[in-house]
Amino acid sequence: MGWWRETIDIVKENDPAARTTLEVLLTYPGVKALAAHRLSHFLWKHGFKLLARMHSQFWRFWTQIEIHPGAQIDSGVFIDHGSGLVIGETAIVETGVLLYHGVTLGGTGKDCGKRHPTVRKGALISAHAQVIGPVEIGENAKVGAAAVVVADVPSDVT
């Protein structure tokens, strides 16, 4: 129950509209998408890649949030609203990160290896921001709404 409690508490801390635990569980697509990703990622790491992709696609349909099963997402991440959010296969998202709707953590093409962003602890990426390629968003950095980021953002920068 630890992950669930932590996730619910993060939602309630960051969204004044989140009044009850039941409301968060039933109405927050980001919570559902992150929970589904935990299983998809487990399947992916253990070689069940097609099953992992099918599972993630099912939840993409229900939440409108696309998280590739290969993406590494720590506990303590908050996806607010979430609709249209995309997280690519080699992305890394650390604890305490806040992601809003329409955010893309995307790649730059068919390169092999690390091709998606790394978002460090406590960073905030606002609505419709596009973070493209193997760039790093530093700890506690803030990326503004509709920004297009193609280079590293240092820690504690807005």
Which ranges hold each PLM region?
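Terminal amphipathic alpha-helical/low-complexity segments used for targeting or macromolecular assembly
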Residues: M1-T63
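Structural signal for interior beta-strand "rungs" in well-ordered beta-sheet cores
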Residues: R60-T158
